[in-house]
Amino acid sequence: MTEQANSGAAAAESQNPQFSLQRIYVKDLSFEAPKSPEIFRQEWTPSVGLDLNTRQKTLEGDFHEVVLTLSVTVKNGEEVAFIAEVQQAGIFLIKGLDAASMSHTLGAFCPNILFPYAREALDSLVTRGSFPALMLSPVNFDALYAQELQRMQQAGEAAAH
C-alpha cells in the first residue's frame, strides 16, 4: 500500500511543472576606459548606449543555461568614456512545461531573474573605473520576448511569400 502511494506521488510530481534556480554566476566581465585619465578632467555630459542580449542552451537532462549580456558604451561628447560588458548566467532546472511555456520561461522569466545581478555587476564595474554609477532602469523582458516572437513570425511570413 505504501509503495503504491509513493509511486503515485512520484508520478504526480513528475507531471507537475518544476522550476528551480541552481546557480547564478558571472560568465564574462570586461571594462575599457580608452580615454582615461584625460576623460576625468572634462565636463561630464554622458550619453549612454545599452545593448541587451539573451541566449540559452540545454545542458544535460532538464538543466538549462541562460546567459544575459549587457553591453554599455558611454560617450562624453564624441569620445568614448568607457565600454563595459557583463555576461550574467544562470543554470535552471525546468521540467514539465509545454514548448511555448518553456520558450517563454527561457526567453523572459529567466533573464528577468538574472537582470538585477547583471545590473549590479555592471554598476560595480563602472564605479570601480571611477565613473558615476549607471542606475539602469528595469527591463520588461516579457515585452522584449513578445517583440521577438512577432519579429520571427513576420520573418517567417515574409519567407513564405
Curated annotation (Swiss-Prot):
One of its GO terms (cellular component) is cytoplasm. The keyword Chaperone applies. GO terms for molecular function: unfolded protein binding. Keywords: Chaperone, Cytoplasm, Protein transport, Translocation, Transport. It is found in: Cytoplasm. Belongs to the SecB family. Homotetramer, a dimer of dimers. One homotetramer interacts with 1 SecA dimer. One of the proteins required for the normal export of preproteins out of the cell cytoplasm. It is a molecular chaperone that binds to a subset of precursor proteins, maintaining them in a translocation-competent state. It also specifically binds to its receptor SecA. This is Protein-export protein SecB. It comes from Ectopseudomonas mendocina (strain ymp). The gene is secB.
